[in-house]
Amino acid sequence: MTRKQKRLALIASGAVVVSLAVGLVMFALRDNIVFFYSPTELAEKPATNGARLRIGGLVKPASLDRQGDQTVRFTVTDMKHDVAVTYTGLLPDLFREGQGVVAEGALRPDGVFHADSVLAKHDERYMPREVADALKKQGVWQEEGKSEGKPSAIPAQTAPQGAQAY
């Protein structure tokens, strides 16, 4: 073999090794890749039933339904479309109606999203960019943090109603 052929064989074998390594990494991560959808995107382009994905938006007011066995049903909306969500477990402390939420799980054949985990929006820094952009585009984005450093006009309640402090 000439020098040129040896160099070409070395480059070709290096490319094969790199391609094989990339293929193995992609194969190992295939279960960890989760696609993100808004309710509108999910309505326009339905995901495959059982495929892992994330949905994000606002918890629709008056949609929260708590069952006795820690099962919670609620609706995620982006003000255009809604997605019914079922979750079993403890919800984050910041979870409430009208707030931003991201749920990760799978869409069942009946159209209900079964969430394995639910993340509540803390403030706009933690909202996925896609959700924030969709909400801003629809005019329902709520700016937070405008009153930082200012005391609240409503005093904090220190005792339950009806209790007397001694």
UniProtKB/Swiss-Prot annotation:
GO biological process, one term: cytochrome complex assembly
Highest rank taxon of the organism: Bacteria
Membrane spanning stretches: 8-28
Membrane-protein topology: Single-pass type II membrane protein
Periplasmic side: 29-166
GO cellular component terms attached to this protein's record: plasma membrane
Record region (Disordered): 139-166
Positions that bind heme: 122, 126
Record topology, Cytoplasmic segments: 1-7
GO molecular function, one term: metal ion binding
Keywords, comma-separated and alphabetical: Cell inner membrane, Cell membrane, Cytochrome c-type biogenesis, Heme, Iron, Membrane, Metal-binding, Signal-anchor, Transmembrane, Transmembrane helix
Subcellular location: Cell inner membrane
Record's keyword annotation contains Ribosomal protein: no
InterPro entries membership: CcmE, CcmE-like_sf, NA-bd_OB-fold
PANTHER family per the UniProt record, alphabetical: CYTOCHROME C-TYPE BIOGENESIS PROTEIN CCME HOMOLOG, MITOCHONDRIAL (PTHR34128:SF2)
Function: Heme chaperone required for the biogenesis of c-type cytochromes. Transiently binds heme delivered by CcmC and transfers the heme to apo-cytochromes in a process facilitated by CcmF and CcmH.
Sequence similarity: Belongs to the CcmE/CycJ family.
Protein name, UniProt field: Cytochrome c-type biogenesis protein CcmE
Organism: Methylocella silvestris (strain DSM 15510 / CIP 108128 / LMG 27833 / NCIMB 13906 / BL2)
